[in-house]
């Protein structure tokens, strides 16, 4: 693949490649995760949950849940489409509410941070308009699974990193209040 930036070849003919189509990633050699990445929710679910709960008093959890879900120190591996899908599957959760409050009142959020990525990975992962999934996956199953992200019936805003955050339009007034109170930028 032209997007494989680093390749390791084995004697048996197999290859391990670092593929980064959109050039968001980086790779550092080492024996452990870097200090700014928490436990993987799909393979270290107990450690993942513990890491969040033991740090819930930190200032980072004062911010809206839709922003905190992108913090890899606590939500390792949760990216843009996964945060939209996780929050959408919690219809009573205002995605602009303080993360600490959301997590304390809705422990299912932490569970979904494990369940949703596992399901997405089992389906082979997503595909974007500018990136075709190289794994021969059932595109229709993944498209059915994605209910919120990039759905024209949903609302969206840009987060502090300039990424589109897709959310249920029932929360649009909450989004506008955040703008009025200068808590997020339009």
Regions found by a protein language model. Name each.
Residues 1-38, 103-104, 165, 171-176, ...:
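Acidic, proline/glycine-enriched N-terminal capping motif
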Residues 54-186:
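Basic, nucleic-acid-binding surfaces and adjacent catalytic neighborhoods in DNA/RNA-processing proteins
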Residues 14-15, 32, 42-43, 101, ...:
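Residue-identity detector for threonine
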Residues 22-60:
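A short, charged helix-loop
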């Amino acid at each position: 693949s032209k997007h494989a930036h680093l390749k390791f070849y084995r004697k048996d003919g197999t290859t391990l490649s670092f593929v980064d189509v959109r050039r968001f990633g980086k790779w550092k050699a080492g024996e452990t995760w870097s200090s700014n990445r928490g436990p993987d929710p799909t393979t270290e679910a107990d450690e993942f949950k513990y890491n969040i709960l033991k740090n819930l008093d930190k200032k980072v959890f004062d911010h809206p849940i839709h922003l905190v879900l992108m913090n890899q120190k606590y939500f390792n591996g949760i990216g843009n489409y996964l945060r939209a899908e996780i929050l959408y599957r919690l219809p009573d959760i205002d995605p602009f509410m303080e993360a600490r409050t959301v997590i304390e009142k809705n422990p299912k959020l932490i569970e979904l941070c494990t369940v949703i990525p596992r399901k997405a990975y089992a389906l082979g992962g997503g595909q974007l308009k500018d990136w075709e999934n190289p794994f021969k996956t059932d595109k229709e199953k993944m498209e059915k699974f994605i209910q919120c992200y990039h759905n024209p019936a949903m609302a969206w805003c840009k987060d502090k990193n300039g990424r589109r955050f897709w959310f249920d339009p029932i929360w649009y007034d909450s989004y506008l209040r955040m703008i009025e109170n200068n808590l997020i930028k339009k």
